[in-house]
């Protein structure tokens, strides 16, 4: 991660707006907590960290349900999308990770009373995941659920069938019981349909697809080292014009900047193949961490799957609520 930050600082040298580029890199400050955790966190405290995280999520979920049932209000938050303390994409991803932590708590906790408590919390969290409008976390959750069988089952075929069945059951239940999830999923299907049939890239998902295609095309002009931070628009404009996308759809703090709503596209444009390789190495090295405790190793892999999927729909390294 620190090699990535150093390389980003070097990339400021070939960025046209160096003040903006430095401000952009400065937002990676939240990673400074990593060496503190690495040097200070003892193994016996890890479970307490997870418990504290779950407590924080419980508070968020109670607040979310209160907004949904209109027991209380929060400025700028609609009952139709009750994500109380962060945007729904990040909140839904946190909820997805919460559900998996609770799943392991239920399996490995011996105390029957705690099993019941965790089971109720599990249902509480799963319902909340599909009540809010964050499709990112919802689909990341379903993908991770299908892959999790490989972590614990020797019979891989049986595991895949079991977890795909479970994922399908959760999806069908959410579609029929959650108006928010049903509306957003129907809108997603409509968006894809008009994108394919009418070449209309003006809606939520199709706009992202247009940005991804434009970014990949733009990256070819500075493939090795990238165009620099804040200069993403330089080679993407003519592609965006083909999709009839106006500048209002991606206004940023500097004239030449674009948020491609995909971390991998963003960094291959900004930092080239070199930057993208560094990003992928971060995931690989985290995956290869020598964690002997099976539960923590599985949770790490689940976390990486969720984070990888989340990053496909947003620049997750560059937000203060980054996981």
What is the role of each PLM region?
Residues 2-4, 18-41, 52, 57, ...:
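Aromatic-anchored transmembrane helix interface
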Residues 198-217, 221, 225-271:
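Long extracytoplasmic/lumenal interhelical loops at the membrane interface
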Residues 9-10, 45-76, 86-154, 162-163, ...:
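Alpha-helical transmembrane segments of multi-pass inner-membrane proteins
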Residues 146-150, 156-161, 269-306:
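Hydrophobic transmembrane alpha-helices and their immediate junctions
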Residues 72-89, 123, 248-262, 267:
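Active-site-proximal inter-transmembrane loops
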Residues 23-26, 83-98, 135-137, 260-263, ...:
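Membrane-interface micro-motifs in multi-pass membrane enzymes
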Residues 152-198, 213-221, 229, 238:
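A membrane-periplasm/extracellular boundary helix in multi-pass inner-membrane enzymes
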Residues 13-23, 130-132, 312-318:
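Membrane-interface helix caps and helix-loop-helix hairpins in membrane proteins
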């Amino acid at each position: 991660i620190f090699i990535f930050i150093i390389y980003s600082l070097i990339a400021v040298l070939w960025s046209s707006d160096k003040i903006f580029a430095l401000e952009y890199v400065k937002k990676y400050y939240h990673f400074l907590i990593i060496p503190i955790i690495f040097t200070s966190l003892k193994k016996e405290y890890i479970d307490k960290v997870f418990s504290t995280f779950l407590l924080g999520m419980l508070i968020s979920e109670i607040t979310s349900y209160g907004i949904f049932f209109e027991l209380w209000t929060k400025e700028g938050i609609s009952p139709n999308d009750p994500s109380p303390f962060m945007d729904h994409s990040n909140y839904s991803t946190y909820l997805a990770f919460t559900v998996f932590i609770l799943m392991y708590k239920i399996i490995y906790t011996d105390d029957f009373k705690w099993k019941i408590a965790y089971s109720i919390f599990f249902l509480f969290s799963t319902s909340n995941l599909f009540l809010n409008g964050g499709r990112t976390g919802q689909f990341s959750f379903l993908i991770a659920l299908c892959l999790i069988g490989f972590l614990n089952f020797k019979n891989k075929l049986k595991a895949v069938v079991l977890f795909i069945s479970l994922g399908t059951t959760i999806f069908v239940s959410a579609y029929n019981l959650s108006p928010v999830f049903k509306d957003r999923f129907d809108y997603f299907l409509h968006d894809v349909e008009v994108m394919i049939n009418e070449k209309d890239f003006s809606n939520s998902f199709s706009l992202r697809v247009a940005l991804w295609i434009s970014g990949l095309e733009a990256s070819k002009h500075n493939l090795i080292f990238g165009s620099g931070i804040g200069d993403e628009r330089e080679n993407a404009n003519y592609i965006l014009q083909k999709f009839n996308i106006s500048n209002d759809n991606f206004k940023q703090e500097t004239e030449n900047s674009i948020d491609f709503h995909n971390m991998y596209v963003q960094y291959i444009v900004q930092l080239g193949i070199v930057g993208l390789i560094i990003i992928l190495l971060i995931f690989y090295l985290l995956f290869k961490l020598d964690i002997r405790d099976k539960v923590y190793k599985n949770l790490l892999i689940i976390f990486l799957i969720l984070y990888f999927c989340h990053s496909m729909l947003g620049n997750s390294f560059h937000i203060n609520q980054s996981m």
